[in-house]
Amino acid sequence: MDVAAYMTELGQQARAASREVARSSTAVRNQALLATAAALDAARSELATANSKDLERGRENGLDSAMLDRLELTSQRIDAMIEGLRQVAALPDPVGVITDMTYRPSGIQVGKMRVPLGVIGIIYESRPNVTVEAASLCLKSGNATILRGGSEAIHSNQAIARCLKQGLSEAGLPETAVQVVSTTDRAAVGELITMPQFVDVIVPRGGKGLIERISRDARVPVIKHLDGVCHVYIDSHADPEKALKVAVNAKTQRYGTCNTMETLLVDDEVAEDLLPLLAEQFRSKTVELRGCRRTCAILGDIVEATEEDWHAEYLAPILAVKVVDGLDGAIEHINRYSSQHTDSIITENYTRARRFLTEVDSSSVMVNASTRFADGFEYGLGAEIGISTDKIHARGPVGLEGLTSQKYVVFGDGHIRT
């Protein structure tokens, strides 16, 4: 069977399964999640064997140490997958919830009901634990899913897929409710993103090149973010202690995440006092600073930033630093260079904080908090399938509710329109 025919078959099966999953009860979907957790626990040896094949092939193909680390399924990571399934099972189910019910002057009642999206396509790279994370969230929210992982994790993903199928079967749900693409042919991605008759939304998780390609070529709506160029702005009304603490955490708590600060903006009124203190903290953590001319004049021995630095998502111990002309300058810089992911202001002035919240056009905007909090778990969503910087449908961390839509429901008692 060629790739196009294979993907069409997966799509047809997913569409049929999505109807059964959508009408299943919360208890049944939770049963499938818990049964999958048990299946993973029982299949540790099989998972380790499959993963070792991927790791061996990865070394032969010259994968770097960071990629191999993301690929590895350690015992602790299997534990985390199992615990993640149990946590998702414990989350409130958004499906079927009716909100905003009101009486209209005509006497009818109008409200909104949460419903599944249908079939969700997930395209991701490297990390096999994403297979479980994504499948569990899609299933809990009443959706079927087709998962296309990276070719480097094919054996691990197929071993996980067998556990998912076992969990679905034990709960009485169709095994085709979660399907992991078994071919490594890259044409499968092209087919998956151009099947609107079978797939309702695509969620890509990977590098910028992958997401740009999917955004350009997809004929299906895409939930995505391209970059995490996040800013912290230290206002002239900032508490210096808070400013130091938040800025250092936003950059150094983890370097390789999309919610890590990549550019630090400092108000010109406090730059002379705060920049040396900030530089000392960052240097102690071996962070390379790249500054504007005013920053270089204050600090002296740092690299001068170029235009590319203001656009950069380093994902590394490198930080761009700019002195700005007050709140106006900070907002102007952020709205020009930000990826609309997460930006934060450090200030004790409520009016200035409100203006920042209103005028900065990002999916998460913060006051006196580290950008590292931009995360579904930290927001109380329980878990997330990704972060969206788009403005239609979901925006920000996308949890269970973001994997549903709404339909209007109307109740009457023989009402007719006159």
Curated annotation (Swiss-Prot):
Keyword check for Nuclease: no
Coarse class of the protein's main subcellular location: cytoplasm
Enzyme Commission no: 1.2.1.41
Subcellular location: Cytoplasm
Gene3D superfamilies: Aldehyde Dehydrogenase, Chain A, domain 1, Aldehyde Dehydrogenase, Chain A, domain 2
Catalytic function, reaction form: L-glutamate 5-semialdehyde + phosphate + NADP(+) = L-glutamyl 5-phosphate + NADPH + H(+)
Function: Catalyzes the NADPH-dependent reduction of L-glutamate 5-phosphate into L-glutamate 5-semialdehyde and phosphate. The product spontaneously undergoes cyclization to form 1-pyrroline-5-carboxylate.
Record family assignment: Belongs to the gamma-glutamyl phosphate reductase family.
Name this protein carries in UniProt: Gamma-glutamyl phosphate reductase
Native species: Marinobacter nauticus (strain ATCC 700491 / DSM 11845 / VT8)
Classification lineage: Bacteria, Pseudomonadati, Pseudomonadota, Gammaproteobacteria, Pseudomonadales
Gene: proA
